[in-house]
Amino acid sequence: MRYFLDTEYNGFGGALISLALAPESGDDEFYAIVKCPDPIVPWVERHVMPYIDMVPIGLGHPALERLDAAQALSSYLAGDTNPEIVADWPEDIAQFCMLLLTTSGDMVEIAPTTFTLLRLPGFSTAANSKIPHNALYDARALRHFVLKSER
């Protein structure tokens, strides 16, 4: 199955703050907030943090330690033998992959996974998102745009 990915992170090259997967099927979404070890940069403090908890009941929970978030992601994808992760920004894929790492030389269990990076000139997740700079709503916006363009 395809999963549309969005992440929020602490400025350019900064630590992961939240990660969302919106499956093509439209149900059983994944959303995790990750404890950030660094002080939050001002732009993120203004544009991301006020909206980070604005998710549907059942998806909201306290921020997780990085390892716990990695294990939650592994559990979420466990039933899919060939997930495809779709993103419109390279940093989203990089953050996803970095979350999989647990220690030097080790990672959480995950099936063989395909990554698709879409270059979408003129499309902005933030401009099309119900709650801009919220990873879940941005992932939903990406899913909606891609599925609509495929019709």
Q: Across the structure, where does each feature detected by a protein language model lie?
A:
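Conserved non-catalytic scaffold segment of RNase H-like nuclease domains
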Residues: 3, 8-87
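Conserved protein kinase catalytic core
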Residues: 12-14, 94, 144
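Alpha-helical packing segments of well-folded alpha/beta enzyme cores
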Residues: 69-73, 92, 142
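Short, flexible loop segments at boundaries between secondary-structure elements
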Residues: 108-130
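Residue-level signal for well-ordered alpha-helical scaffold segments within enzymatic catalytic domains
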Residues: 75, 98, 144-148
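Substrate-recognition/cap helix-loop segment adjacent to the acidic, metal-dependent catalytic center
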Residues: 91-110
